[in-house]
């Protein structure tokens, strides 16, 4: 049902999926099922600390709904002001209710209740970016873009550790899909309604997705204002004024409605000292966060983004790299004022990074006729490298598990989190 709703969102955004797109999505999902099953079956992992939070919440949600529907709904809505809301438990109950209720079962269930919808939205995003860039070789572009983004290690990292936070990316990708080429020339009720609902849902999924929301809408507003300035300079002042009017009207109405809808969460945020409460998790500020981002990207993805920026400069298409870059900078600066990111919080940066990834895959696809075999070989190598990255609470660098086992690397950031984990366990 969720996937069908996402396909409808893609249609509203003008990014419909054809048979080839759906076949690739299904193939990726099938590989993910095998990957999750094999990885979870071949490891030993104790679900404690943050890695048990949602499992325990799922138990509590089941117990509440077992009493009555009213008690269950009260449990869900009673967490609106909490850092961990119970919103996600509504969507992860099936097929978890059919399992042995272990931590591994909870992690594996996400392949069925979250991943299909996430992949459909990601596919729509890949198609939409290709449309904006006017990519001519759509087949190779979609194949490269869809596989390289879906295989990115830190997309699945938190899910493998029992944290279903990638659920929020469903709505993050929906926001991008619905807004990237929308310029508010007129207010489309269905589109703006979906944008509002996706924004509310991503905030409900996890509080820290607000950093993505603020960063993205700030960058998006700047992009629209820059477009209006160009229109005005070109003699189309009336069209520019219409865009500004519609943007302001939608923005004000959305903010008021969002504050009313999420008032328990908003009032808690305004009254709570997050910087003081989470200063314990601030291990090095912006410098450490920059190290995390470089390590989590990996050399090949960094090269892919550089290739994409060169492609955008060559084709004079600055809107997407500027949108993604501005969103990332604002989100990173805001987040590091409070703490540094763990693997699950890194998810809030993936929409921006994936736009940059897709710029790179567009460059690869456009030049596929030159050194085709070399490029296909590099693509296959990067996929295998991405799929072999160890999913661990202490994973700082995106490198395969067998490399870590044979060539252990001592990293100050990793040592910090080891100390943090032991200290938290001792406190408990």
What are these regions (language model features)?
Residues 1-10, 422-428:
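Conserved small/polar residues in nucleotide/adenosyl-binding loops
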Residues 105-135, 174, 178:
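Transmembrane-helix motifs of polytopic, lipid-linked glycan transferases
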Residues 157-167:
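Short acidic/glycine- and proline-prone juxtamembrane loop motifs at membrane-interface regions
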Residues 247-255, 364-400:
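Signature aromatic-anchored transmembrane alpha helix within multi-pass, membrane-resident enzymes
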């Amino acid at each position: 049902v969720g996937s069908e709703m996402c396909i409808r969102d893609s249609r509203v955004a003008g990014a419909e999926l054809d048979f080839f797109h759906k076949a690739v999505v299904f193939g990726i999902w099938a590989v993910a099922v095998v990957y999750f099953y094999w990885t979870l079956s071949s490891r030993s992992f104790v679900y404690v600390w943050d890695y048990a939070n949602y499992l325990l919440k799922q138990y509590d949600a089941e117990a509440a709904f077992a009493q009555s529907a009213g008690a269950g709904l009260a449990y869900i809505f009673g967490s609106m002001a909490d850092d961990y809301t119970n919103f996600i438990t509504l969507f992860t109950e099936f097929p978890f209710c059919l399992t042995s209720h272990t931590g591994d079962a909870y992690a594996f269930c996400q392949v069925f209740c979250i991943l299909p919808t996430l992949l459909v939205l990601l596919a729509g995003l890949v198609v939409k970016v290709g449309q904006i860039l006017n990519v001519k070789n759509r087949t190779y572009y979609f194949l490269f873009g869809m596989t390289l983004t879906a295989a990115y290690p830190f997309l699945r990292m938190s899910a493998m550790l029992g944290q279903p936070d990638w659920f929020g990316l469903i709505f993050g990708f929906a926001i991008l899909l619905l807004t990237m080429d929308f310029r508010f020339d007129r207010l489309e009720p269905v589109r703006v309604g979906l944008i509002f609902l996706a924004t509310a849902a991503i905030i409900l999924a996890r509080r820290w997705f607000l950093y993505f929301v603020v960063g993205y809408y700030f960058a998006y507003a700047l992009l629209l204002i820059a477009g209006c300035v160009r229109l005005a300079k070109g003699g189309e002042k009336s069209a520019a004024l219409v865009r500004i009017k519609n943007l302001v009207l939608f923005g004000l109405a959305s903010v008021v409605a969002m504050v009313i809808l999420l008032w328990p969460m908003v009032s808690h945020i305004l009254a709570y000292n997050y910087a003081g409460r989470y200063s314990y998790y601030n291990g090095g500020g912006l410098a450490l966060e920059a190290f995390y981002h470089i390590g989590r990207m990996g050399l090949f993805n960094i090269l892919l983004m550089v290739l994409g920026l060169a492609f955008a400069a060559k084709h004079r298409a600055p809107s997407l790299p500027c949108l993604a870059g501005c969103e990332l900078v604002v989100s990173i600066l805001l987040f590091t004022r409070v703490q540094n990111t763990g693997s699950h919080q890194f998810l809030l940066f993936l929409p921006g990074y994936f736009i940059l990834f897709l710029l790179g895959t567009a460059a690869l696809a456009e030049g596929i006729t030159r050194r085709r075999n070399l490029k296909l070989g590099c693509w296959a190598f990067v996929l295998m490298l991405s799929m072999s990255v160890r999913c661990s609470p202490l994973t700082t660098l995106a490198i395969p598990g067998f490399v870590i086992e044979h060539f252990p690397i001592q990293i100050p950031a990793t040592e910090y989190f080891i100390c943090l984990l032991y200290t938290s366990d001792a406190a408990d």
